């Protein structure tokens, strides 16, 4: 009788263990668009621009590898309450995880998972082309962890028009293959440089990934330079609807703001953007966050030398194109300078009322081409102004 009871207990225990294993496996099984990803080691040569798609899929721009990599973060649980992320010395915490000093950590981009509200950072262990790429997750409790790339559902697509490396150039074009990304209506929009005559490019890549066609290349009027330009990459952009039409609002170094019709961004097309604002020279835009507050539309723009700007976006369709040298350094769409935000290095939307910023002292170099920020680097939640 005792033996029989023991066997029954063992059988029940095994059944519970199997059921638990199935439950865990089901919880980890990719869903939605993430189900198209396959487990294995994600091969990244660098980790730069980030963007989130549906179902917790994180897109990583790998400029050195000339590819975009989609990762299943397995991070699809919504928080039970309002999230505020505040972490002092996040670079110090990352350095401790990988066994280096904080000055060997460079944070390249910041995005918030729209489902879980966890913060994701692309970073590098070391400096230069041989640096080790890292993807870092920070939760609302301030816990910092690495997203393992060794066995993760993923997929990648190679860019057919990536520029060749040129270490003798003032700024290596290969390192600017991907400068910013956004997921827009089933496509990953990828800004950066290409190997075309008009080297400034915007690529539209359908997801799930199959192949990437060549991007559209761009020409813009740069009023502070007094000329049309085709070689300067978009630094940051957001999709935006103006009078019912889909546009890309793109910001460039020194600092034209340009609208580009999405309908014209066909493979191989040469597209002329329309400059609608000149925000000021001697500056590099870092990130943009569009939002609505008190019945009005705004775009918050983080910059290297201009600080944080609050752009009024209610009537973007009413501003005439800027296509000739301007008398002043600032023209077009009006904005307010926000002096209460200092040393912002990264900006990302958290929800409809808040954003997350990464702050740190500016690195060496001119403000339009700054070096890596100097730590300590801090994550902070702010209210959208």
For each predicted feature, which ranges?
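Sequence/structural signature of beta-propeller domains
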Residues: 25-385
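N-terminal secretory signal peptides that target proteins for export/translocation
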Residues: 1-7
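Bacterial N-terminal signal peptides
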Residues: 11-21
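General helical secondary-structure elements
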Residues: 5, 24-25
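Helix-centric, low-specificity signal for extended rod-like, repetitive segments
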Residues: 2, 21-22
């Amino acid at each position: 009788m005792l033996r029989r009871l023991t066997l029954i207990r063992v059988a029940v225990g095994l059944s519970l263990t199997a059921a638990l294993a199935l439950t865990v496996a089901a919880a980890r099984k990719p869903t939605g668009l993430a189900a198209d990803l396959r487990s294995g080691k994600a091969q990244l040569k660098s980790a730069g621009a980030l963007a989130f798609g549906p179902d917790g899929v994180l897109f990583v721009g790998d400029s050195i590898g000339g590819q975009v990599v989609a990762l299943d973060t397995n991070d699809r649980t919504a928080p039970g309450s309002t999230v505020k992320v505040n972490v002092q010395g996040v670079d110090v915490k990352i350095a401790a995880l990988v066994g280096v000093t904080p000055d060997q950590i460079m944070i390249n981009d910041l995005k918030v998972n729209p489902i879980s509200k966890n913060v994701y950072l692309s970073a590098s262990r070391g400096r230069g082309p041989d640096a080790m790429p890292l993807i870092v997750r920070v939760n609302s409790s301030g816990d910092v962890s690495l997203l393992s790339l060794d066995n993760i559902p993923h997929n990648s697509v190679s860019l057919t028009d990536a520029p060749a490396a040129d270490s003798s150039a003032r700024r290596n074009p290969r390192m600017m293959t991907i400068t910013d990304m956004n997921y827009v209506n089933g496509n990953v929009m990828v800004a950066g440089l290409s190997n075309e005559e008009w080297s400034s490019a915007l690529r539209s890549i359908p997801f799930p990934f199959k192949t990437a066609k060549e991007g559209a290349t761009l020409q813009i009027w740069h009023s502070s330079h007094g000329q049309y330009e085709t070689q300067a990459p978009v630094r940051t952009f957001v999709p935006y609807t103006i009078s019912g039409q889909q546009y890309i609002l793109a910001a460039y170094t020194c600092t034209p703001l340009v609208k580009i019709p999405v309908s014209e961004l066909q493979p191989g097309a040469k597209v002329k953007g329309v400059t609608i604002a000149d925000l000021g020279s001697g500056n590099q835009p870092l990130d943009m966050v569009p939002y609505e507050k008190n019945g009005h539309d705004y775009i918050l723009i983080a910059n290297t030398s201009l600080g944080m700007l609050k752009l009024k976006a209610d009537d973007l369709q009413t501003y005439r194109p800027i296509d000739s040298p301007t008398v002043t350094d600032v023209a077009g769409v009006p904005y307010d300078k926000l002096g209460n935000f200092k040393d912002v290095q990264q900006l990302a939307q958290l929800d409809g009322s808040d954003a997350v910023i990464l702050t740190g002292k500016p690195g060496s170099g001119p403000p339009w081409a700054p070096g890596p920020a100097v730590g300590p680097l801090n994550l902070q939640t702010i209210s959208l102004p």
